[in-house]
């Protein structure tokens, strides 16, 4: 696993796993981490395991709707990373999944599929392909994880109204949406 780190202090209390968007790298989220200046956080920023079809950068999912999607390497990577974060001294309830675009979609699908509650999930400009599947596959424990969905109105790639619809559906199904 290729991993980058960022922290503002020597005694972080919260771990933030920063998941880049499509064609990103382990360096993509560092400017975000720096600009947020969260004194109590240590950022873990992994590189997605699949090479992007564009030839530049990396992707969390590989394949297509026709041929099927490869995600096993991604979920194995996150399982390993969560274990590393916990070995570094962070409890599950002090771990935040923060993802941008495709990384935001991953933060939701992974974070809601695990069998425990996290400190939070923050998807930014995330695209949720199958909202009903996401809702139905969530564990009872992960449904309690607070989710802060962020999406700008001027997004030319992912329509922000889809995020509003997904957030409303999730809230109606008992998720902790903010």
Residue map of PLM features:
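The conserved beta1-alpha1 loop
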Residues: 17-21, 125, 151-152
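Gly/Ala-rich beta-loop-alpha elbow adjacent to hydrolase catalytic centers
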Residues: 98-103, 107
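A conserved short beta-strand
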Residues: 116-128
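Short beta-strand/loop motif that positions the catalytic acidic residue
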Residues: 143, 148-151, 155
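Catalytic histidine neighborhood in serine/cysteine hydrolases
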Residues: 167-178
